[in-house]
Amino acid sequence: MIQTKDIIELTDTYGANNYHPLPIVISKAEGVWVEDPEGNRYMDLLSAYSAVNQGHRHPKIINALIDQANRVTLTSRAFHSDQLGPWYEKVAKLTNKEMVLPMNTGAEAVETAIKTARRWAYDVKKVEANRAEIIVCEDNFHGRTMGAVSMSSNEEYKRGFGPMLPGIIVIPYGDLEALKAAITPNTAAFILEPIQGEAGINIPPAGFLKEALEVCKKENVLFVADEIQTGLGRTGKVFACDWDNVTPDMYILGKALGGGVFPISCAAANRDILGVFEPGSHGSTFGGNPLACAVSIAALEVLEEEKLTERSLQLGEKLVGQLKEIDNPMITEVRGKGLFIGIELNEPARPYCEQLKAAGLLCKETHENVIRIAPPLVISEEDLEWAFQKIKAVLS
């Protein structure tokens, strides 16, 4: 049997050096548990950046995959498939939007939102050609494609990739006055994460989302919520925007939309926004393919049937409370909503993630000094308590 060190050696030899993973190879997974080739078990506290909210290899989702794979997997968008229509309806009703545009990865859905906002600005708002602007927040993470990188405030993400997309205005996260000051007659959209994930589980001030939406409505600016990581139960609400009772003009969804089994993403908005497209103006050969749609329908049903959103809220509140009781001056803050939790340290978090790995827990540092805790939402209370005791031992 091939061993962990052999796999890592192959990866280092032939793989582009664009990731810095923990030195572990996962060869098997089920629920909240994963195994390496040697049979060592670990609890997954990352959930593939919230793509595995329903747990690894959920039986209902896997059965949907197998059933659809035995019938048809890809039609392209040149033809209709029997899965796309039902999937459209499922997502439209979930988001309470009239239209859905399917893609594959989260970054593709972000690019879709950028194109939508710009075209809406020209066709509907009547912004002068090639002058549309998009407002984003500092420390955002919307992906790695050129549009997403152009919106980043992290210069390392941009280094060597210029020129960037023009018309991007960056403001401090959660700063309402900065948003007001940044809006011009050319502003097409305000795109933000309702809770910033890669920034270290950064939660905006209470009421900010609602106030920002009101400003956008007053100024005729689209309010676009990137819920790729935060959506679909992760924060203890179906969407993180729900914490402020906010319904954005457009949702960007991905990750858990595919149940940790098959990539699928989308933008969802009403007809007056997504209706700006005509055939040929945007698309994807694999976007909305029947295999992805069948998997996604099952993934959304699992969230509903197993009440994973409510579970995230209940377990998350308990875990945040426990983590806040750990007595160590190295911990500067514990923050989170649902099972989307950040433990901020006053020193680099990577060594502690490596210690947690040795203790049987897999998590990843983010924003240098934050340990992100985001297990699959199917985790049992007993398993979460076991994880807490391990975390407490390492951080005490």
From Swiss-Prot:
Disulfide bonds: none annotated. GO terms for biological process: L-proline biosynthetic process. One of its GO terms (molecular function) is pyridoxal phosphate binding. Its cofactor is pyridoxal 5'-phosphate. One of its GO terms (cellular component) is cytoplasm. Its EC number is 2.6.1.13. Gene3D superfamilies: Aspartate Aminotransferase, domain 1, Type I PLP-dependent aspartate aminotransferase-like (Major domain). Coiled coil: none annotated. Pathway: Amino-acid biosynthesis; L-proline biosynthesis; L-glutamate 5-semialdehyde from L-ornithine: step 1/1. Keywords: Amino-acid biosynthesis, Aminotransferase, Cytoplasm, Proline biosynthesis, Pyridoxal phosphate, Transferase. Pfam families: Aminotran_3 (PF00202). The keyword Metal-binding does not apply. It catalyses: a 2-oxocarboxylate + L-ornithine = L-glutamate 5-semialdehyde + an L-alpha-amino acid. The keyword Oxidoreductase does not apply. The modification N6-(pyridoxal phosphate)lysine is found at K255. It is found in: Cytoplasm. InterPro entries: Aminotrans_3, Aminotrans_3_PPA_site, Class-III_PLP-dep_AT, Orn_aminotrans, Ornith_aminotrans_bact, PyrdxlP-dep_Trfase, PyrdxlP-dep_Trfase_major, PyrdxlP-dep_Trfase_small. Catalyzes the interconversion of ornithine to glutamate semialdehyde. Belongs to the class-III pyridoxal-phosphate-dependent aminotransferase family. OAT subfamily. PANTHER family: AMINOTRANSFERASE CLASS III, ORNITHINE AMINOTRANSFERASE, MITOCHONDRIAL. This is Ornithine aminotransferase. The gene is rocD.
